[in-house]
Amino acid sequence: MSATDFDSLYQLIFNAGLVICFGLGVISGGQR
C-alpha cells in the first residue's frame, strides 16, 4: 500500500467522521 493510498483513505475516514458527528448533532438537536 503506497503513501498516497493511505493518505486518501485517512482523508475518507476523517471526512466520514465529520459527517457522522455533524449528522448526530443535527438529529439530537432536532429532537429537543
UniProtKB/Swiss-Prot annotation:
It comes from the Viruses. The chain crosses the membrane at residues 9-29. Keywords: Host membrane, Membrane, Transmembrane, Transmembrane helix, Virion. It is found in: Virion; Host membrane. GO terms for cellular component: host cell membrane; membrane; virion component. Belongs to the inovirus G7P protein family. This is Tail virion protein G7P. It is a single-pass membrane protein. The keyword Hydrolase does not apply. Pfam families: Inovirus_G7P_2. Its main location: virion. InterPro entries: Inovirus_G7P_2. May initiate with G9P the virion concomitant assembly-budding process, by interacting with the packaging signal of the viral genome. The assembly-budding takes place at the host inner membrane. In turn, G7P and G9P are present at the end of the filamentous virion that emerges first from the bacterial host. The keyword Transferase does not apply.
